């Protein structure tokens, strides 16, 4: 159906099983999961699909090596299982990618090797190659432009890489094949309630400037860093459930890497992780982790972030990138779940949480691309428990 036909479909006063607010990774995933079970689904995205965080990732499908230091083994295990599933299920937009951790201090080689062996162990019977220690010559072979002053060797491991925006569009198209109806440039302005229970939404189509009343049995809020604004349409709460964090990436020319392998800086002076990742004819450098107060759909990189990335990655290149070598910059916002016990965003977990309000609104926050499928499945499972009719069939994904 074209856009006009879709809105005519809404005007028939159909009551959908699910209304999903938000057309990023989680929203599209929920639309696909629910529609594949046989439920009727309408999804509304205020901007374009994957306009926000979901198209501004580091392009990695990974378990999260850095979470091992925080003993978040369950999170790593789930992410590694989902990594393998996603690689098999979407092989046309994913690929394996090798990384090297260059080592300049003797004991660190074994420290990183031990951590990555634990990563291998948690991944179980994965089809990814196992990590291994490599000597200085091999590091230079894999990373021709690496700074070899004081280089002692390194550790090599593999993870997944993907095209985030293309995967998002593919998920949306697949959901439509299962019968879901997806709308972009359509914002939810208010809820329709009966006896304080949500029964639908009022949607503004920014293309035609029309308002549509759309009814449903379940409404799921999947708006990422903007989740609080949708919750506030339901009820005012003084407590924010989201603590947004900004991540900036620099894109430089491929000549600075000269390899199909990337490298990982496991610990910067302030305890963060940085990547240099081959991406088509370019190299992605990133990312930062800075708290922000008010989320924006088009966040702007800060000069301090640009300087931070360049300062830390320069130490690892022989031919060093300068500001004039930056081809483009992109910035995304992480929808981290707020935790009063953690003062810094870099210490917050990438775990997701699912909230249900008294009115029946389900909000899912947190998570990342790697685990989008599992998060979507759990969210729809919870919604099904609230839904009076049983699922026509089980999740097929």
Q: Where does each model-flagged region fall?
A:
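Single conserved hydrophobic/aromatic residue that forms the stacking wall/gate
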Residues: 387-397
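Glycine-rich FAD pyrophosphate-binding loop
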Residues: 36-54
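Extreme N-terminal leader/targeting segments of oxidoreductases
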Residues: 1-18, 36-37
């Amino acid at each position: 159906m074209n856009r006009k036909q879709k809105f005519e479909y809404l005007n028939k006063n159909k009551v959908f099983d699910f209304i999903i607010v938000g057309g990023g990774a989680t929203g599209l995933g929920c639309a696909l999961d629910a529609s594949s079970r046989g439920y009727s689904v309408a999804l509304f995205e205020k901007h374009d699909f994957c306009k926000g965080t979901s198209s501004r990732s580091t392009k990695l499908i990974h378990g999260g090596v850095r979470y091992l230091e925080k003993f978040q083994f369950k999170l790593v295990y789930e992410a590694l299982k989902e990594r393998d599933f996603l690689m098999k299920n979407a092989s046309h937009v994913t690929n394996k990618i090798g990384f090297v951790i260059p080592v300049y201090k003797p004991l660190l080689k074994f420290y990183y090797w031990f951590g990555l062996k634990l990563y291998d162990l948690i991944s179980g019977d994965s089809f990814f190659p196992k990590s291994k220690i490599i000597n200085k010559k091999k590091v230079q072979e894999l990373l021709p432009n690496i700074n070899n002053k004081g280089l002692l060797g390194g550790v090599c491991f593999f993870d997944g890489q993907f095209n985030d925006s293309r995967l998002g569009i593919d998920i949306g198209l697949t959901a439509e094949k299962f019968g879901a109806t997806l709308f972009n440039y359509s914002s939810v302005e208010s809820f329709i309630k009966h006896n304080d229970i949500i029964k639908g939404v009022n949607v503004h189509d920014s293309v035609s400037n029309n308002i549509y009343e759309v009814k449903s049995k379940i409404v799921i809020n999947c708006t990422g860093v903007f989740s609080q604004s949708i919750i506030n349409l339901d009820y005012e709460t003084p407590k924010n459930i989201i603590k947004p964090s900004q991540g900036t990436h620099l894109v430089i020319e491929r000549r600075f890497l000269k390899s199909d392998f990337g490298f990982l800086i496991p610990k910067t002076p302030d305890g963060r992780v940085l990547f240099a990742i081959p991406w088509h004819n370019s190299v992605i450098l990133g990312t930062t982790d800075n708290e922000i107060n008010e989320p924006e759909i088009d966040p702007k990189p800060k000069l301090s972030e640009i300087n931070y990335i360049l300062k830390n990655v320069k130490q690892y290149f022989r031919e060093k990138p300068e500001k004039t070598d930056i081809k483009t910059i992109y910035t995304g916002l992480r929808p981290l779940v707020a935790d009063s016990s953690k003062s810094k965003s870099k210490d917050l977990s990438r775990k997701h949480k699912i909230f249900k309000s008294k009115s029946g609104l389900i909000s899912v926050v947190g998570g990342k691309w790697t685990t989008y499928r599992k998060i979507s499945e759990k969210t729809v499972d919870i919604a099904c428990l609230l839904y009076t009719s049983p699922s026509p069939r089980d999740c097929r994904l």
